[in-house]
């Protein structure tokens, strides 16, 4: 069964890597959301926060899975956090993939980034349960 997947990533730093990950699925029975023309993102990011949130919410519509592509500077970014929070709120499955070892357009890799799931938790039986305990992360294998 095909699932529509939203990809969350640090656009400026990891767009090339994210595109490579997306293209690895081309022959698979999957649909991807969260990939957009760079000119579109350049226009969107000029808008105010409420317009950006609306745009992200529209990208998340119809998705059931959110894959957070974790690069060196992904964790703690405002829009990554919003995408994680929104995805969890709409009960999307979440999955983290470290992409620091994937080469960028210049052939360079980067340092492993902090897991953004470590910033988020739910309360269960009066105890914090961090997203790192709820959602798996993996390393991208070239």
Model-derived features: positions:
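Conserved N-terminal substructure of TIR/SEFIR domains
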Residues: 1-62
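C-terminal interaction surface of TIR/SEFIR-family domains
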Residues: 4-6, 105-142
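Conserved nucleotide-binding/hydrolysis micro-motifs of P-loop NTPases
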Residues: 12-14, 101-104
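A short acidic (Asp/Glu
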Residues: 18-19, 78-81, 106-108
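Conserved beta-strand termini and adjacent loop/short-helix elements that scaffold enzyme active sites
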Residues: 36-38, 97, 131-134
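Flexible, active-site-adjacent loop/turn segments at secondary-structure boundaries
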Residues: 50, 77-78, 115
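Conserved beta-strand-loop-alpha-helix hinge of the TIR/SEFIR fold
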Residues: 59-85, 93-103
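Anion (oxyanion) recognition and catalysis
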Residues: 88
């Amino acid at each position: 069964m095909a699932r529509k997947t939203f990809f969350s990533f640090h656009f400026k730093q990891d767009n090339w890597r994210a595109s490579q990950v997306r293209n690895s699925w081309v022959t698979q029975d999957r649909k991807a959301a969260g990939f957009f023309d760079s000119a579109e993102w350049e226009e969107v990011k000029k808008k105010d926060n409420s317009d950006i949130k609306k745009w992200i919410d529209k990208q998340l519509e119809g998705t059931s899975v959110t894959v957070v592509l974790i690069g060196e500077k992904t964790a703690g970014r405002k829009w990554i956090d919003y995408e994680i929070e929104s995805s969890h709120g709409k009960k999307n499955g979440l999955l983290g993939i470290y992409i620091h070892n994937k080469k960028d357009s210049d052939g360079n890799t980067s340092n492993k980034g902090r897991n953004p799931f470590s910033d988020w938790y739910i309360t269960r039986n009066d105890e914090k349960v961090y997203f790192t305990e709820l959602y798996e992360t993996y390393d991208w294998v070239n």
